[in-house]
Amino acid sequence: KDPETYHSGGPFDPVTGKYLFAGGESYNDIMRDYLLDKMKKDSSVVAINAATPVIVGFTKDKREIAGKQFVDVGIAEETAAAMASGVATYGGKPVWAVFSSFVQRCYDQISQDICINESPVTMLVFAASVKAFKDVTHLGIFDIPMLKNIPNLVYLAPTNAEELLAMTEWSLEQKKHPVAIRVPSVVEHAKGEVAKDYSEIKFLIHPPSLRVFTYYLSSKLTIKEGSDVTG
């Protein structure tokens, strides 16, 4: 009767049939609110997904609000990647939400359709953590080795909600290259300054003692390997 709700499975109340959630903030809801607001202000923003709209909080009522600015291509991540590249090529601002474990399904399209063409696609990678899915077919721990080796792709890893939103905003407004963003699993909020421009990646490290050690390690690696290290 409700295939969308029961697509993913999980603990539920046998009487009501409703899922049992821990409650509290989620990045799904945070990104949903951000994207719906962004869509109202900018008609060129298009959210794309492959049969898992709940990962960005786009339930049926929210999809109706988004209208044509939300596209579900069905269980076909390859199509989602190719469509995102096409939308970006023609001046749109595609936001493609995908589970980490499903990145493998469309590696060719990410590499060739998106990255070779340097299409400014924003790719939100969800459940990319040991804290996410536990079953062997959905482990979210292989996205980094897969994506970091693709030329022309910038892969960002925010540590809190404010960084996630800032990185997404920056990615949508830049037109130079595709950007993937590794959405955290547990909601945290920034305790310090949040950067707005990610064209040159730098680590923001606290406390100062750890910062000194990181700079020291970075300088040693630069000398030993002969290549610059982000610090």
Regions found by a protein language model. Give the residues of each.
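Thiamine diphosphate
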Residues: 1-182, 187-188, 210
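Long hydrophobic segments that form regular secondary structure
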Residues: 91, 176, 198-209, 216, ...
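Short, flexible turn/loop "capping" segments at secondary-structure junctions
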Residues: 148, 224-225
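Aromatic-enriched
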Residues: 187-204, 213, 221
